[in-house]
């Protein structure tokens, strides 16, 4: 109920702009205001679809500008330290090592990682079922492949005794490991390895993208591997690419030094 408005049909663009301004004045963050605006737009689009309104006034109001911060990431040295931490001579250590190797090699979302089935694994490739049931092909390198082969060997031995398991990384009772369980195990390995930086599955996903771009990968290719529907989501990594170009210029241009 705002400024004498009794029915959605009375809402004008100016009303929504005032409301957005009020939210900002109330101290709500840009991301929270963006969520409010999104909910409001969905409501109006629903009313248009139902024939209650002719058009949706919220579509004409610009959203709050969100800060394009590069997410927290890990250095390549930190990742190497983390990968060296799990004891690969034990079953759980080998499983954890395979999961961390694969996460860093592919940039999967944690839900995609813990939900992997053995039949999604092909020679050097994963078929990933991501958001909205979209499938994408993601390659992985030799280091991850070696650890995965060792882990699959263990799984094959267990299948002889217990019967086959469809999951690549089963937790208790043969079901997929929970995201929380993997998160906790990852954090514990990071702590034992003495890594000061914050470590989470999402941080490793960002490390995958950041390190790829800093070594010259194309943003479109990174977008495809991450499963971003929109390139704008991947564009947070552009300044990593710019920094790399500056280094290349300094190293190779005769007047770069």
Predicted regions and their residues:
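Conserved catalytic core of the tyrosine transesterase superfamily
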Residues: 1-257
């Amino acid at each position: 109920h705002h400024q004498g408005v009794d029915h959605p049909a009375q809402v004008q663009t100016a009303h929504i702009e005032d409301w957005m301004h009020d939210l900002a004045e109330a101290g709500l963050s840009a991301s929270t205001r963006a969520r409010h605006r999104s909910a409001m737009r969905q409501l109006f689009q629903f009313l248009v679809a139902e024939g209650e309104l002719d058009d949706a006034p919220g579509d004409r109001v610009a959203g709050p500008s969100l800060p394009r911060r590069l997410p927290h990431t890990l250095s390549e040295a930190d990742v190497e330290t983390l990968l060296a931490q799990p004891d690969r001579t034990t079953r759980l250590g080998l499983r954890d090592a395979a999961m961390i190797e694969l996460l860093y090699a592919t940039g999967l979302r944690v839900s995609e990682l813990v939900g992997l089935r053995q039949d999604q694994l092909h020679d050097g490739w994963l078929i990933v079922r991501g958001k909205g049931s979209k499938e994408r092909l993601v390659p992985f390198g030799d280091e991850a492949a070696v650890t995965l082969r060792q882990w699959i060997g263990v799984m094959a031995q267990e299948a002889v005794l217990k019967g086959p398991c469809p999951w690549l990384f089963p937790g208790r009772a043969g079901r997929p490991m929970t995201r929380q369980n993997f998160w906790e195990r990852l954090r514990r390995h990071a702590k034992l390895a003495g890594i000061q930086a914050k470590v989470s599955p999402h941080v490793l996903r960002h490390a995958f993208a950041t390190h790829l771009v800093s070594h010259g990968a194309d943003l479109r290719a990174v977008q495809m591997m991450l499963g971003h529907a929109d390139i704008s989501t991947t564009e947070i990594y552009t300044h990593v690419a710019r920094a790399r170009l500056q280094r290349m210029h300094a190293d190779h241009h005769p007047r770069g030094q």
